[in-house]
Amino acid sequence: MSFNIKEISEMIEEQIRNYNKEIVQTEQGTVVSVGDGIALIYGLDNAIMGEFLKFPNNVYGMVLNLEESAVGAIILGDETLIREGDIVKRTNKVVETPVGDALLGRVINALSKPIDNLGPINFTKTRPIERVATSVMARRSVSQPLETGILAIDSAIPIGKGQRELIIGDRQTGKTAIAIDAIINQKNKNVKCIYVAIGQKDSTIVQVVEKLKKYGAMEYTVVVNAGASQPAPLQYLSPYVGVTIAEEWMENGNDVLIIYDDLSKHAVSYRQMSLLLRRPPGREAYPGDVFYLHSRLLERAARVNENYGGGSITALPIIETQAGDISAYIPTNVISITDGQIFLSSELFNQGVRPAVDIGSSVSRVGSAAQIKSIKQVSGTLKLELAQYYELELFAKFGSDLDEATKATLDQGAKIIQMLIQKQHNPLEQVDQAILLLTIKSHLIKWLPVESIYNFKHEILSHFKNDKHAFELRKKLDEQKTFDDQLQQQILKEAQKVVLKITKNINEYKPGTFGNISEYQNLGK
């Protein structure tokens, strides 16, 4: 066998020319222990907080504890595939999530993988799930209403775009129902919605998604599901995934509504992980930084100025209380972070007042700045009248000998409560809310028995949509979004016609028991 020296030298020269001296350097460690969704890793001395780690069998983790001799990581996948002694590699990346309009209409898990059997998501951009909240100078004041379509909330506890409003109450008081109604009411309002389910039953999530599909709300909604069957690390990550998706839209000038259902279970999952990572426990065994857990999440909701996109994120976190105790650790934390709370009472719920909003205990720190003028004009005395009613109701139980003024206050309060009762998934437009509130403010409902109020609501809304003259007045109010004296009188006259129509159909109706007879005779004139 003969060798051509020239050919060999050419081959060697070619290889020298194409030699790539780049060295790929990877840092790796070893799993010391694994269990309960936590891995302790030795050897990753340069790992950073929140870094993505790669385990064998395509399982990933995230650094959550940095100790002198080891790194504590949460496992974002099947921990049964990991063994002691396995090699763990750094990725030099933090946890990221896909963002953009491709997610609309989809149900994803906390790792942003689709779980709705509708195929892969064609995303073009990702963002890290942890980032500093929008700075003070980048924000705008909250001045635009985010309509929930729920009369009790939009009138007495208004929510503005960019606000954080807590929904708090015992289990089975309608917290999720309010959140779902708020999403359904955003149809055709150019608001994108995100529903983050934390520790919920999978059957509950299926029902939520079916409701959203039924009312055409899934087309502008993303559902992030970290259900009760998911490990604690995924439940911990899910709200941050949700708000990261929202931030992309906010920076592109969109308004976003995000629901966290619920942050009580989020705190429990974080407590579980912290105890397993051997962090020192504090009050109720929660770690010392549980306040920061929620504050850094909720502070990312904002309304930004035009230089930063001009969009907004409105957050409605949900907290579940035990026997109405809002002074527990997590409820007080979240109350102090948010811009107000909607308190749901199990007592009201059991009395049939639904939504069971306790208006006396609820507050919106943004207030009337987040209301259109027409609603602001007619809802001013609502909270006061209800407060007087609840105060007098307690005294009325002790004696039946009441003066006329007290009877009138009790009667008006009972009728207001009936006016605020609303069927689920039946949102009201702002113009319809303004008309209903006008009938309350003008004391027009005093002519009706309490049991006729629900029928009155249906009749008056129907009248202003079907009667030609009334419809024109409704349209005018919708356009100018404020009551002038003439329009107010014209709308009241139409409302009086509805009252007369109902009272004529009541057997043995005696107007004298409700007010001055001559005043009743002038209705509709």
Swiss-Prot record:
Keyword Ion transport: yes
MF-aspect GO terms: ADP binding; ATP binding; proton-transporting ATP synthase activity, rotational mechanism
Source species, domain of life: Bacteria
Gene3D superfamilies: 2.40.30.20, ATP synthase alpha/beta chain, C-terminal domain, P-loop containing nucleotide triphosphate hydrolases
HAMAP family associated with the record: ATP_synth_alpha_bact (MF_01346)
Keywords of this entry: ATP synthesis, ATP-binding, Cell membrane, CF(1), Hydrogen ion transport, Ion transport, Membrane, Nucleotide-binding, Translocase, Transport
Protein name according to UniProt: ATP synthase subunit alpha
Swiss-Prot/TrEMBL site (Required for activity) positions: 362
Catalytic activity: ATP + H2O + 4 H(+)(in) = ADP + phosphate + 5 H(+)(out)
Species this chain originates from: Mycoplasma mycoides subsp. mycoides SC (strain CCUG 32753 / NCTC 10114 / PG1)
GO CC aspect terms: plasma membrane; proton-transporting ATP synthase complex
CDD domains xrefs: ATP-synt_F1_alpha_C, ATP-synt_F1_alpha_N, F1-ATPase_alpha_CD
InterPro entries: ATP_synth_asu-like_sf, ATP_synth_asu_C, ATP_synth_asu_C_sf, ATP_synth_F1_a_nt-bd_dom, ATP_synth_F1_asu, ATPase_F1/V1/A1_a/bsu_N, ATPase_F1/V1/A1_a/bsu_N_sf, ATPase_F1/V1/A1_a/bsu_nucl-bd
Function: Produces ATP from ADP in the presence of a proton gradient across the membrane. The alpha chain is a regulatory subunit.
UniProt membrane topology term: Peripheral membrane protein
EC number, UniProt record: 7.1.2.2
Binding site for ATP: 169-176
Location of this chain's protein in the cell: Cell membrane
Subunit structure: F-type ATPases have 2 components, CF(1) - the catalytic core - and CF(0) - the membrane proton channel. CF(1) has five subunits: alpha(3), beta(3), gamma(1), delta(1), epsilon(1). CF(0) has three main subunits: a(1), b(2) and c(9-12). The alpha and beta chains form an alternating ring which encloses part of the gamma chain. CF(1) is attached to CF(0) by a central stalk formed by the gamma and epsilon chains, while a peripheral stalk is formed by the delta and b chains.
